[in-house]
Amino acid sequence: MLDFNRLEQYRENNRIEAKKALGGLPKSIWETYSAFANTLGGVILLGVIETADKTFDSVNLPNPDSLIREFWRIINNPLKVSVNILAGKDVYVEEVDGDRIIVIKVPRADRADKPVYVDNDIRNTYR
């Protein structure tokens, strides 16, 4: 579990990915979702940047609820993502130093759901 009061202690790795997301959902979110689902799972942080020294810092998302609605709409579209393995509890808003960020906890996909791929093309399977 991440300690959001100490966000600056984390760095991107094969289980944590930071995305600024101020202009909406980043296109790369689906590749990250696929990669996490097809491996050991991971956490996507929207409204978080990686600084020059590779630590994390939050940026305030002006309308996180709208981004979450858009996320659910897209992830439930089988033409975009082969399978949605998330539950409601896996996507939520967290406050960090007065900034609102979105946390997306992606579990490891069950064998029956693998591979998880994007854009209705099994060649778009990420690990």
Range-by-range predicted roles:
Residues 1-127:
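Conserved N-terminal catalytic/coupling substructures associated with nucleotide/phosphate chemistry
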